[in-house]
Amino acid sequence: MATKKKIGLVLSGGGMHGFAQIGAIKVLEKYNIKPDLIVGSSVGALVGAVLAAGLKMDDVEDALLNENLLKLIKPTFGPGLIKGEAISRFALRTIKVSKFDELKTRLIINATNLSKSKEVVFEKGPLLPALTASISIPGIFTPVNHNDDLLVDGGFYDVIPLHLAEDMDIIIIIDVSNLDYKITPKSGVLDIMKQSVVNLQRRIIELNLRAHVKTHEILMICPNVSEYSMFEYKRSRQKEMIKLGEDEARKVLGDIRARKILGL
């Protein structure tokens, strides 16, 4: 009898583009695709925690669309404009879980250690600091003080932390990072800074894919969310992103290669 292949699900960062991840996962659920491991960066960490706790995406969609997400934004003073902890606490209240070992599916979350210029990986202990660190975009969210180090958004080290799923056989990536950013001769200083970060992120993704494509079966679900802001709070637009995620997942999973890999 053939050994069942282990499936890893890797969820990228991307701010409010995470609504498209919810849509894509709804399709995975309909195909009864259950990951053995979930890896999340930034918003992917939040979506991943909810999925790892065993919640269905239809219920998550209802909870989010019925919540005033703007009230979770807590202005602050210091090395960031917003405290991200309220967002993490909302996620934990929703899933009624506070520690990694209480989750139903193994979860790994990444963050960036600014103090030591390296990646931090969370898979044990309390979820709150891990989630808060992973979503803390520098300059917008206050960094998390963890063991006297400052931690920020995991996407600044690796927005698609594919390497954290290398012990899996099949890796499904849901990428909503939207690295299609372009600058023009009229672009300002902030645009140029953003493009520099995007170029670095693209290079890291390319190197990761090259390193794993020969040893793993990889499926990529990449909803086109380029026309949506990473800070999209309009409900109608959030619903549109969920639909985009569903449509792209159906397209990818309907492909002959994907069906063969997943045994559909």
List each model region and its residues.
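Patatin-like phospholipase
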Residues: 1-41, 49-264
